[in-house]
Amino acid sequence: MKVQQYRLDELTHLVKGELIGEGSLQFSNLASLENAEVNHLTFVNGEKHLDQAKVSRAGAYIVTAALKEHLPEKDNFIIVDNPYLAFAILTHVFDKKISSTGIESTAQIHPSAVISETAYIGHYVVIGENCVVGDNTVIQSHTKLDDNVEVGKDCFIDSHVTITGGSKLRDRVRIHSSTVIGGEGFGFAPYQGKWHRIAQLGSVLIGNDVRIGSNCSIDRGALDNTILEDGVIIDNLVQIAHNVHIGSNTAIAAKCGIAGSTKIGKNCILAGACGVAGHLSIADNVTLTGMSMVTKNISEAGTYSSGTGLFENNHWKKTIVRLRQLADVPLTQITKRLDHIQAQIESLESTFNLRK
C-alpha cells in the first residue's frame, strides 16, 4: 500500500505557522526526536529537548521562533507559538482513518433503528430497537447498542463496547474497547440484614467531543441521569457511578473512582488513582494530585493533595510509628506541651535581653 506523503508547505498552512526552508519536501509521518528519519516531521517542546533536537535526523522541526535560534545547523522549520498544539493538530493528518461506510453482513440491527447512510457498522455489531446512529459514525465489531440508544455524528465506538440504559451520545464522541456506558448503578436498600436492589431508572447523557478510554464503567442514574458535559476526557480503567455530573473539559486519569451523586466542576483535573466519595461537590478549576482521596466538598479552585509520598522503606516505618504514637496523645495535651515550651522560650529570651 502506498504511503501518503504531505508537503512541508501544506503542513505549515494547516497549523497557521511560518515556513522556513524547502516547502516542497515530502513527509510520510510524525516521529519522536530520537527516532525520526529524514522523511519525518518532529517537534521541540521546550529548551530541555534541544540537545536531542541537535542530533536528530528529522527532515523538519516544529518550533517556536526562540527555539529555532538554538538550532542553527538545521534547515527546515515550521515556526509556531505552541509546538505541542501544532503537533496535536498534525497527528490527525497522519492518522489512519476508517473510510468504509455501510453495514457488514454479520451485524444484527433492529428494523426500527435509524442508521445514517454514511455510518459504518462493523461485524457482529448488535443494535436494538429505536436506536439512532448519526452521519460518519464508526461502530467497530462486537459492539452492542441496547434499545433506545442514540449516537451522534462523527463518533467512533471501538470494538466490544456496550451502550445501554437508553444512553444518549452527542457528536464527535470517542469510546474505546470494552467500556460499558449506561450499566446498572450500584444501588441497594439495606433492610433486616439484606440488600434490596434498586432498579436504576435514569440514563447517561454524554456531550460533544467527549473521549472515554478502554475498560471504563459509566453507570446510569438511579432516577436522574449521569451526565458528562462537552469536552470531558477520561483515561482507561475509570469508574463513574450513578448520578455523577462531570463539568465540561474536565480530565480524569486512569484508575480514578467517583462515587454516586457527586458533582465535579468544569476544567478540573483528576490525576491517576484519585478516589472521590459520594454526594460531594467539587468546584470548577480544581486539580487533584495522584492518589488523592476526597471525602468533603471542595468549594474553591486550586490544587489539592492527600496521602504520603514515597520515601525509603525504613524511614517510612519509623514515620508510621511516630504517627501512631502521636495519635495516642490527646490533642489538648499536645497543645498544653507546646504552650509550655513557648512560655519557656519567651522566658529565656526575656532573661537574655535583660543581661544585655
Swiss-Prot record:
Q: Does the keyword Phosphoprotein apply?
A: no
What biological process terms from GO does the record include?
lipid A biosynthetic process
SUPFAM superfamilies xrefs? Trimeric LpxA-like enzymes
Gene Ontology cellular component annotations, sorted alphabetically: membrane
Q: Which UniProt keywords apply?
A: Acyltransferase, Lipid A biosynthesis, Lipid biosynthesis, Lipid metabolism, Repeat, Transferase
Q: What residues sit in the active site?
A: H242 (proton acceptor)
For this UniProt entry, the molecular function terms from Gene Ontology, in alphabetical order, are: N-acyltransferase activity
**Record carries keyword Repeat:** yes
Tell me the route in metabolism or biology where this protein functions: Bacterial outer membrane biogenesis; LPS lipid A biosynthesis
Return the EC number: 2.3.1.191
Q: Which reaction does it catalyse?
A: a UDP-3-O-[(3R)-3-hydroxyacyl]-alpha-D-glucosamine + a (3R)-hydroxyacyl-[ACP] = a UDP-2-N,3-O-bis[(3R)-3-hydroxyacyl]-alpha-D-glucosamine + holo-[ACP] + H(+)
Quaternary structure note? Homotrimer.
Q: Which family does it belong to?
A: Belongs to the transferase hexapeptide repeat family. LpxD subfamily.
What is this protein's function per UniProt? Answer: Catalyzes the N-acylation of UDP-3-O-acylglucosamine using 3-hydroxyacyl-ACP as the acyl donor. Is involved in the biosynthesis of lipid A, a phosphorylated glycolipid that anchors the lipopolysaccharide to the outer membrane of the cell.
Record-given protein name: UDP-3-O-acylglucosamine N-acyltransferase
